[in-house]
Amino acid sequence: MKLRRLPNGDLEVTTRKGNIYRAVDLHNGWFNIWDEQREEVVVMIQYMDEFFETIAYREFHLN
């Protein structure tokens, strides 16, 4: 995964397959990736500078 900080503080997440998702900043070191089709949070990311940890939420994996 490749992460890029957006001007509004959110993250742009690019997967190995080239899919792009937006991770919303929760302002506590965590970011949610929202799946619009499922209407639910599918992944939570903890981001600190260039280090990040991805925690799968439910059984959805980003492609």
Located regions from the model:
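Short intrinsically disordered terminal tails
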Residues: M1-K2, E59-N63
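Acidic, low-complexity, intrinsically disordered interaction modules
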Residues: T14-Y57
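Negatively charged, low-complexity tracts enriched in Asp/Glu with abundant Ser/Thr
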Residues: M1-T14
